């Protein structure tokens, strides 16, 4: 019945840790190697030593490589078109966050709080791309979570701690690395409280999720199953401290501009009709820049959650000119990506100016922003990309407005031959 008696080796001798000298019944576990043993306490001590050395090495190595806000913004400019105000806000917030990690342990007098970020902007305005680019620039683990799939613990759906598990997966379960990562929570506006009044029924995907997320964002020790998860339930859970993980939450917040306008109208004293007319002339981007915490609370975010998102950056709706620039200018612009694909077939592709304008117009009509540009171009080039590998001597493909509108086929230019239409 009682299993507390010390186990013995094959020769009936007690086994001892080769490092600290404790016997096997003085420790929880004794791990055997070729003619040596190590106990769980010594393993933990070794882990602590390695962890401290890694932190010192990371802090000393990164301090000289942390880009300044100007440098961060310059790199964002290479990948994201427009959104200058949001880039400036993000550059400062991210710089301060990682500077805080480097200097946090060196200053005992002042404790620097974490500044999580809330991005507000329409679909396809670049919220996710900004967060992805920041993580790539800083070389830190990055994961995206969809707030609409999250529920409170115990209900059908994803538990909020699954977010940390995804972050761990991105860095091969390196806990130290994960604890300095970036988490982007998309569609955060979809978990707003359903009404201003507290509900009698359980709101498992709204306020409840906000409360659960709040714990992660504030900083908690999250228990995450190791690799293998449920397949190996006997494994001990990994403990991840979320205090230094940067959370960036993004959402379209449809209807928020109306709340802001209503608040602004109430603020006017007299001449209300004149104030109203001035308010109505502002663009959605200008209105959103005037957002206050009370507007977000009225929208449905709980006050505690809003309080943990001190940095708010608003993104403008992209106009046709911005979409054309997105197609052509960024480092990984779509036209450059398709040009590379065609190069692999020893062929060039030319997008004429009117074609880019037609693609941008179509994206504006679909209200998909920059997100819809790729699918439009994929549809336009589908037949050409299907036929091209089977065709010989095609040196160039020309796309113009009529091709985008579906009124004509792309123009194919052959080597040492007369130009032909794709329909020939």
Curated annotation (Swiss-Prot):
Statement: the UniProt record of this protein carries the keyword Lipid metabolism: no
Gene Ontology BP term (one): cell division
Gene3D superfamilies: 1.10.8.60, ClpX chaperone, C4-type zinc finger domain, P-loop containing nucleotide triphosphate hydrolases
PROSITE patterns, per database record: CLPX_ZB
Domain of life: Bacteria
Residues binding Zn(2+): 17, 20, 39, 42
Binding site for ATP: 122-129
Cellular component terms per the entry's GO annotation: HslUV protease complex
Entry's transmembrane regions: none
Molecular function as annotated in GO: ATP binding; ATP hydrolysis activity; ATP-dependent protein folding chaperone; protein dimerization activity; unfolded protein binding; zinc ion binding
Pfam families: AAA_2, ClpB_D2-small, zf-C4_ClpX
Keyword terms of this UniProt record: ATP-binding, Chaperone, Metal-binding, Nucleotide-binding, Zinc
UniProt domain ClpX-type ZB: residue ranges: 5-58
Subunit structure: Component of the ClpX-ClpP complex. Forms a hexameric ring that, in the presence of ATP, binds to fourteen ClpP subunits assembled into a disk-like structure with a central cavity, resembling the structure of eukaryotic proteasomes.
Family under the similarity heading: Belongs to the ClpX chaperone family.
PANTHER family, per database record: ATP-DEPENDENT CLP PROTEASE ATP-BINDING SUBUNIT CLPX-LIKE, MITOCHONDRIAL (PTHR48102:SF7), ATP-DEPENDENT CLP PROTEASE ATP-BINDING SUBUNIT CLPX-LIKE, MITOCHONDRIAL-RELATED (PTHR48102)
Its biological purpose: ATP-dependent specificity component of the Clp protease. It directs the protease to specific substrates. Can perform chaperone functions in the absence of ClpP.
Protein name: ATP-dependent Clp protease ATP-binding subunit ClpX
Organism: Nitrosococcus oceani (strain ATCC 19707 / BCRC 17464 / JCM 30415 / NCIMB 11848 / C-107)
Organism lineage string: Bacteria, Pseudomonadati, Pseudomonadota, Gammaproteobacteria, Chromatiales
Gene name in the database record: clpX
